[in-house]
């Protein structure tokens, strides 16, 4: 994907389901077309295939499992690819994995030609994740997730230091930041600190006017 990337995670919010989810996806498509900034979405699993078919935007899964076959209820990487997704989140703070599982999921993503967005919670874990050569490492201090307090303002060092740590391991791995991202100023600050984009959720999904929020997010890029 072109940089910067704004990736919107719908989580399991009611506001990110059904018709409301479609309205968010439509707004993301419109703002991406008008601004030229890449806006990806990670909708709920039942929406993956229809959204991939209907909208001209990058669609990511919220999780994949490094399995296939007789594993009821799991989400194999090949299924996500078959649905039309470009990638998947891995190890989100609300769906944590072991180091071995993270590595296996990154490899499953690569095998199925999917981008991998490995979520981390600090500089050390970001460096460890970079060793698996995912597409992105997305650092999110857990205490700021959903807080309305932007990591770009509250803890800019974690962005700057994560970028440095990741690039020391692999210059090919891109870095996103998340937690409390809610405005164009937050996005610009993150990019100025070296990030390749942002990962966010509630500020868009729970907004009364998601399109207006998305327009603000890209306004300073």
Swiss-Prot record:
It is found in: Cytoplasm. One of its GO terms (molecular function) is triose-phosphate isomerase activity. Keywords: Cytoplasm, Gluconeogenesis, Glycolysis, Isomerase. The active site is at 92 (electrophile), 140 (proton acceptor). It is an enzyme of class 5 (isomerase). GO terms for biological process: gluconeogenesis; glyceraldehyde-3-phosphate biosynthetic process; glycerol catabolic process; glycolytic process. Pathway: Carbohydrate biosynthesis; gluconeogenesis; Carbohydrate degradation; glycolysis; D-glyceraldehyde 3-phosphate from glycerone phosphate: step 1/1. Gene3D superfamilies: Aldolase class I (3.20.20.70). InterPro entries: Aldolase_TIM, TIM_sf, Triosephosphate_isomerase, Triosephosphate_isomerase_arc, Triosephosphate_isomerase_AS. The keyword rRNA processing does not apply. The keyword Cytoplasm applies. Substrate binds at residues 9-11, 145, 180, 201-202. It catalyses: D-glyceraldehyde 3-phosphate = dihydroxyacetone phosphate. Belongs to the triosephosphate isomerase family. Involved in the gluconeogenesis. Catalyzes stereospecifically the conversion of dihydroxyacetone phosphate (DHAP) to D-glyceraldehyde-3-phosphate (G3P). PANTHER family: TRIOSEPHOSPHATE ISOMERASE. This is Triosephosphate isomerase. It comes from Methanocorpusculum labreanum (strain ATCC 43576 / DSM 4855 / Z).
């Amino acid at each position: 994907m072109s940089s910067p990337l704004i990736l919107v995670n719908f989580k399991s919010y009611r506001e990110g389901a059904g018709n409301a989810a479609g309205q968010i996806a439509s707004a993301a498509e419109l703002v991406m077309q008008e601004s030229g900034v890449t806006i990806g979405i990670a909708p709920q699993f039942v929406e993956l295939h229809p959204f991939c078919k209907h909208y001209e935007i990058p669609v990511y899964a919220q999780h994949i499992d490094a399995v296939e076959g007789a594993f009821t209820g799991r989400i194999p990487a090949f299924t996500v690819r078959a649905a039309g997704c470009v990638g998947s989140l891995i190890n989100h703070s609300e769906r944590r994995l072991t180091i071995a599982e993270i590595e296996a999921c990154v490899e499953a993503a690569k095998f199925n030609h999917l981008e991998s967005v490995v979520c981390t919670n600090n500089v050390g874990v970001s460096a460890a994740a970079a060793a698996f050569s995912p597409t992105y490492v997305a650092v999110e201090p857990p205490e700021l997730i959903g807080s309305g307090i932007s990591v770009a303002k509250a803890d800019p060092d974690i962005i700057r230091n994560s970028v440095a740590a990741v690039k020391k391991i692999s210059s090919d791995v891109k870095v996103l930041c998340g937690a409390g991202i809610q405005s164009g100023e937050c996005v610009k600050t993150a990019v100025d600190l070296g990030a390749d984009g942002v990962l966010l959720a509630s500020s868009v999904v729970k907004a009364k006017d998601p399109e207006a929020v998305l327009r603000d997010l890209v306004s300073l890029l």
